[in-house]
């Protein structure tokens, strides 16, 4: 559980001075990890968010995901998959989720509006000196025809990303 009070300017009556008030946001998160055996791990999370906008109706958010992690002992390959659903009323009730990524990379995107996200990560160690990493991720927004704005505008409701990495240790 987490609660936070952000100060905002609040002026619904167009006063000369904008009074500053606290705008509360609350998050509740529960996570479940289960090691099926020495090779497979299952991880699941559910997160809820509540955001009080004072002059408007409160905003809510919901996110859930399930991860399948595969890491065999003494094998040169490993990988993981995430399937995720999110639904929030607007950007203020967004929810952040850490994602597994390529080595030395990181991803903590924010999720708002309504949609799905999945990603697949793979790693193959060719030798002690050479390894390859690959990642494919895609977000599908249920109720949008365009994503982003300006130079980042995407016509369509899908946003995809691909990362490939080769590491040579010497």
PLM regions: where:
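Exposed, low-structure sequence patches enriched in small/polar residues
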Residues: 1-170
């Amino acid at each position: 559980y987490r609660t936070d009070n952000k100060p905002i300017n609040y002026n619904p009556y167009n006063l000369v001075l904008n009074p500053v008030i606290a705008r509360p946001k609350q998050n509740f998160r529960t996570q479940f990890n289960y090691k099926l055996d020495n090779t497979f791990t299952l991880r699941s999370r559910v997160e809820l968010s509540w955001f009080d906008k004072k002059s408007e109706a409160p905003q809510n958010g919901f996110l859930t995901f399930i991860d399948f992690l595969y890491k065999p002992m003494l094998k040169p390959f490993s990988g993981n998959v995430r399937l995720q659903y999110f639904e929030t009323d607007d950007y203020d009730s967004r929810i952040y989720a850490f994602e597994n990524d390529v080595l030395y990379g990181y991803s903590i995107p924010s999720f708002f509006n309504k949609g799905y996200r999945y990603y697949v990560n793979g790693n193959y160690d060719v030798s002690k000196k050479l390894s390859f990493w690959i990642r494919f991720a895609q977000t599908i927004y249920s109720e949008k025809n365009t994503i982003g704005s300006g130079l980042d505008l995407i016509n369509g409701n899908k946003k995809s990303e691909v990362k490939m990495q080769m590491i040579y240790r010497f």
